[in-house]
């Protein structure tokens, strides 16, 4: 039933490019220059458009939770299926926000790398001692989540199982992570508890690894807090060294990477990691 088929497509900034274009047209020409149903560039448009394209009339939602948006959408899609509200969900994230406003905004927050112009390909260097901020990327990553019964009934190739999910927040600072890794470690433990899995079952983590000084340091700490003695045994890498930070799309793309890691039994490297940082001393 198409009413059992839903969409959770997230975006951190939505149609920010469209919004900037329309603002410019409004100020330069007047209100008649602003046209189109997506004139405001609202984030829920992505989920609406996908649902209309594939005829998905089930639960439909957009999640705007900054860099966690894509993962948030996947997790809530998992819950939607687990709660019996849908059998199939398209879920993930999309982002296209390399625009003057977003670049200026993140630069003003000192989050973006501004010293890598001589070698832009190596500017994004997660966990490296010489990292200086993230490099913005664009893209999309969407997965089809469904019950095991649904997948087998249609003869689908099953890549992996989404076993558990948890969500929380630091309630500490608008951009900086908690200096003791409290929120991140609690979320990791919550996901393991929800999945009914021991810490020792984790062999690989596709890290958030943004290439910012604070995130990479405290993310490493969070892994130590959550996994304790098992933390050094886990292989950890960040995709952002290769493709940059896709913001709201990051979780969707990186979930696909995890699916491929399980399917191929190969772990991707952290591109541009050259100089070890004593604060980021896991594998």
Regions found by a protein language model. Name each.
Residues 1, 44-46, 73, 147, ...:
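Short, well-ordered amphipathic alpha-helical segments that serve as non-catalytic structural scaffolds
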Residues 6-11, 64, 89-95, 137, ...:
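Short beta-strand segments
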């Amino acid at each position: 039933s198409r009413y059992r088929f839903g969409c959770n497509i997230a975006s951190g900034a939505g149609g920010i490019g469209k919004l900037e274009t329309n603002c410019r047209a409004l100020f330069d020409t007047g209100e008649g220059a602003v046209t189109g149903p997506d004139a405001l560039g609202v984030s829920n448009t992505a989920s609406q458009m996908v649902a209309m394209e594939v005829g998905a009339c089930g639960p439909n939602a957009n999640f705007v939770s900054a860099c966690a948006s894509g993962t948030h959408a996947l997790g809530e899609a998992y819950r939607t299926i687990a709660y019996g509200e849908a059998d199939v969900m398209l879920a993930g994230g999309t982002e296209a926000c390399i625009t003057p406003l977003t670049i200026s905004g993140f630069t003003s927050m000192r989050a973006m790398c501004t010293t890598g112009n001589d070698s832009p390909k190596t500017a994004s260097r997660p966990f490296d001692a010489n990292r200086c901020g993230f490099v913005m990327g664009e893209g999309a990553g969407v997965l089809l989540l469904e019950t095991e019964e649904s997948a087998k009934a249609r003869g689908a190739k099953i890549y992996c199982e989404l076993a558990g999910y948890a969500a929380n927040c630091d309630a500490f600072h608008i951009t900086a992570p908690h200096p003791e890794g409290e929120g991140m470690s609690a979320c990791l433990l919550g996901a393991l508890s929800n999945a009914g899995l021991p810490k020792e079952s984790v062999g690989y983590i596709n890290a958030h690894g943004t290439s910012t000084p604070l995130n990479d340091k405290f993310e490493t700490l969070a892994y130590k807090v959550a996994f304790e003695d098992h933390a050094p045994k886990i292989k950890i890498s960040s995709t952002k060294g290769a493709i940059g930070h896709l913001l709201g799309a990051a979780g969707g793309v990186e979930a696909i990477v995890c699916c491929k890691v399980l399917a191929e039994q190969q772990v991707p490297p952290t591109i541009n990691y050259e100089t070890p940082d004593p604060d980021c001393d896991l594998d």
